[in-house]
A protein has these predicted regions:
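Loop-to-transmembrane helix entry
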Residues: 3-22, 98, 102, 144-150
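Residue-level signature of mid-helix packing/kink "hotspots" within the transmembrane helices
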Residues: 20-28, 111-112
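Helix-to-loop junctions at the C-terminal end of transmembrane segments
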Residues: 26-38, 122
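Structural signature of the two symmetry-related core transmembrane helices
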Residues: 41-56
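Intracellular juxtamembrane helix-capping segments at the cytosolic ends
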Residues: 79-92
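A late C-terminal transmembrane helix in Major Facilitator Superfamily
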Residues: 94-130
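A membrane-interface helix-boundary motif in multi-pass transporters
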Residues: 120-154
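Multi-pass alpha-helical transporter architecture, strongest
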Residues: 150-175
Length: 175
């Protein structure tokens, strides 16, 4: 909301609620139609979509477009975590509870590290006075937040590459 210069109430309602609604719709949709859709295709779409939405939210000068991108990010990421559990359980059907514990710990670590590094980039852009160098409109804080969001687009790309590797491994096992 600060990065897009929106009032707090409007930002909370549109951003958090929109993200949550789209997250729920994505998971519900996969629950209904998942038997007809490859989880790897869903995760590829989700990774590419999340990356695109992060970039759109970061570079959009229009607050409405930025908020729409934040909401649609919820749809894009909705199946990334559950999808990783589906892929792991199909690849290692006898792994048991320890696999899910490791996946949970890895997911928590990834969520924490992603937020941490995004915050580092945001703080560095603001502290080093790079906002005027970057030439974006807005306050130094807004430019720094947008820069951090732009940096965060790398994480869904990492998810995409891992998913493509796992898909290739699954195809080799099937042949």
């Amino acid at each position: 909301e600060r990065g897009l210069a929106l009032p707090k109430l409007l930002g909370d309602m549109l951003g958090v609620c929109g993200f949550s609604l789209m997250l729920g719709l994505g998971r519900t949709g996969y629950g209904i139609f998942g038997d007809r859709i490859s989880i790897h295709k869903v995760m590829t779409f989700g990774s590419l979509g999340a990356c695109a939405m992060y970039i759109l939210a970061a570079v959009s000068g229009n607050p409405f477009v930025g908020m729409l991108a934040c909401g649609l990010t919820g749809l894009c990421v909705s199946m990334l975590w559950p999808g990783s559990i589906v892929v792991a359980s199909r690849a290692l059907p006898l792994a048991g509870a320890s696999m899910f514990a490791l996946l949970s710990a890895g997911g928590d670590l990834g969520a924490s590290a992603g937020s941490f590094f995004t915050g580092l980039v945001t703080d560095a852009v603001e502290a080093m006075g790079l906002s005027s160098f970057l030439g974006q409109a807005g306050t130094a804080e807004q430019v720094a937040l947008r820069s951090g969001l732009l940096f965060a687009a790398v994480f869904p790309l990492c998810c995409l590459f891992v998913n493509l590797i796992l898909k290739r491994m699954a195809e080799r096992q099937d042949t």
